[in-house]
């Protein structure tokens, strides 16, 4: 996962893309304007052409992305945070990191032990199948603890 500044940069880039796409699509779909007879009476309840639908769609996308940008900006650390607060936050993060590393090491250790048991069981199964195919009497090996 990216850090907050990268997320903010991506959101701003997305917002710029949406502005460019909105302008391009609206220019492409806009009907030619007639300057001699300008009509302003438009039915507001129902879009009369796809251009209005595109305008509503892009307005919603741009508004949502702008809200995302605001949320990301608000989540950035403030300038008022002192060095002591930052140091305390870093110590807390370091402790959490060490705890997570210890849990990870334990899980890896248990996974390795389980893998070893599975490999031993597979080797026993393979030996039993070989003995069965060759017609040799099967010898049971005592289970390892």
Curated annotation (Swiss-Prot):
One of its GO terms (cellular component) is mediator complex. Residues 79-112 form a coiled coil. It holds the Pfam family Med21. Signal peptide: none annotated. Keywords: Activator, Coiled coil, Nucleus, Transcription, Transcription regulation. Its main location: nucleus. It comes from the Eukaryota. Belongs to the Mediator complex subunit 21 family. This is Mediator of RNA polymerase II transcription subunit 21. It comes from Danio rerio.
